[in-house]
Amino acid sequence: MDTLSPFAVDRRLGGRVRTWLSAAVCAVSAGVCAVVSGAAWAGAQVEEPLADSVRTALSAAIGRTEPVLVFADAAQRQQCEGWAVSLEAKLLKRKPEELVRREFLQTVCYEAKRAGLEPGLVLGLIQVESGFRKYAISSVGARGYMQIMPFWSRTIGNGDPASLFHMQTNIRFGCVILRHYLDVERGNLFMALGRYNGSRGRAEYPNMVTAAWRGWKL
């Protein structure tokens, strides 16, 4: 079994996946800092050059193209399973098949926590970006649940934009990218969400995501 899972990566790398991202951003800001949505929210996200340290950190956080959901221990599995069960009813209309629904929620919990994000925030972002549609494509080409722009697969992935339609791959990219933007914006969620959507500094998109997030809080 492939052990390069989100929690396994944290173990192998000494729990430094999130630390790498923050440290890399801080290092870049000390020098020269080089730093999507459903049809209604197709952002104008622009590919920006990344410093080598940031690119390396993001690539390490992404890991393999199609990660396997392998929990580090029973407690972590139970935590995400319990969270998923508690929210299944709310997702029933969007994902009527029980196994698909549960796998989706567990994956969101898993990847969000790996990136140091609130799972409910990730659900809110997915709701606004794609309406929970796995194969959503925006007018600017953003793909999947978290509307990942294809250039990210070339910049920090395997170069195959089709892989962004794989559920866990897409959610992992989205969580890692949002974590990166939070680090760039020094923890300012409003600005990070705007950067994610390509509408940095404007209120409408961040307000929609945070409103959707409230609907997923237990």
Predicted regions and their residues:
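Catalytic glycan-binding domains that act on GlcNAc-containing polysaccharides
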Residues: S59, E66-L218
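N-terminal secretory targeting signals
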Residues: M1-A89, K93-L99, R214-L218
